[in-house]
Regions:
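Conserved helicase ATPase motor motifs in RecA-like P-loop NTPase domains
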Residues: 34, 49-55, 174-182, 192-205
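Pre-Walker A (Motif I) flank of P-loop NTPase domains
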Residues: 43-49, 63, 80-83, 136-137, ...
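Conserved helix-turn-beta segment of the N-terminal RecA-like "Helicase ATP-binding" lobe
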Residues: 92-120, 193
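Motif I (Walker A/P-loop) of helicase-class P-loop NTPases
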Residues: 58-69, 97, 186-189
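Conserved pre-motif I regulatory segment
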Residues: 2-50, 60, 66
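Conserved Walker A/P-loop ATP-binding site and its immediately adjacent core
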Residues: 80-103, 144-148
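SF2 helicase catalytic motif II
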Residues: 144-148, 153-197
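Conserved motor-coupling elements within RecA-like helicase/translocase cores
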Residues: 122-139
Length: 205
């Protein structure tokens, strides 16, 4: 319904369907907190999502992010990374990558409405080079790897950073896990990232 009303890009009606991989595609009905998150993001306002396990927290940020990506690519097809999602553990990034792949189910190779890649230190040199050469719309990483990307002087990392210029979304999943010194480190990283990427309109979630 949101796509029909023009709130979301029309492609989102097909992307965000339940049961796609089981051949039982059905409309996805959003919870109130997901609708509120969408409204905030579309106004370029940062926000925090606090909700129970299994209540669709990830969709609270991925729906507005992917909607923005699809709309932006229609106007400017140049490849760049528009969103970085930081996870406290690689296992969470791996799991999220699998979930996002489900939303791409049914799209022919090379015709996916958005692209996503993991850059957590688990990747081979060839995989890192592919990310640098062919930047994903969404980059899944951890804060230590993001720190390395910003401080190392390897050509691959420089390319990744260059493709993130003007970053639009930065998500800190499981925000409550960053406490004490680590919390201070992450806060500083966010400030440095905003400055380095010239992300003046950055939405933090």
């Amino acid at each position: 319904q949101l796509a029909k009303d023009g709130v979301l890009h029309t492609d989102c009606a097909h992307i965000f369907q339940a049961g796609k991989t089981e051949g039982k595609a059905a409309d996805l009905h959003l919870y109130v907190h997901q609708l509120q998150s969408l409204a905030k993001a579309q106004k370029h306002q940062s926000f925090v999502v606090t909700t129970g396990t299994g209540s669709g927290k990830s969709l609270s940020f991925f729906i507005p992010i992917i909607d923005r990506i699809v709309k932006a690519k229609a106007a400017d097809p140049q490849k760049r990374t528009r969103a970085i999602v930081i996870y406290p553990m690689n296992a969470l990034a791996n799991s999220q990558l699998e979930e996002l792949d489900k939303f791409l189910h049914g799209y022919p190779a090379g015709e996916a409405p958005f692209t996503v890649a993991r850059y957590t230190g688990q990747e081979s040199a060839a995989e890192r080079q592919e990310i640098a050469s062919n930047p994903p719309d969404i980059l899944l990483t951890n804060f230590m790897m993001l720190e390395l990307i910003l401080t190392r002087f390897e050509d691959v990392d420089r390319q990744v950073v260059e493709h993130c210029q003007g970053l639009e979304f930065l998500v800190l999943d499981e925000l409550h896990t960053y406490r004490g010194r680590q919390g201070a480190d992450v806060a500083l990283l966010v400030r440095r990232l905003r400055e380095r990427l010239k992300a003046d309109q950055l939405v933090c979630i």
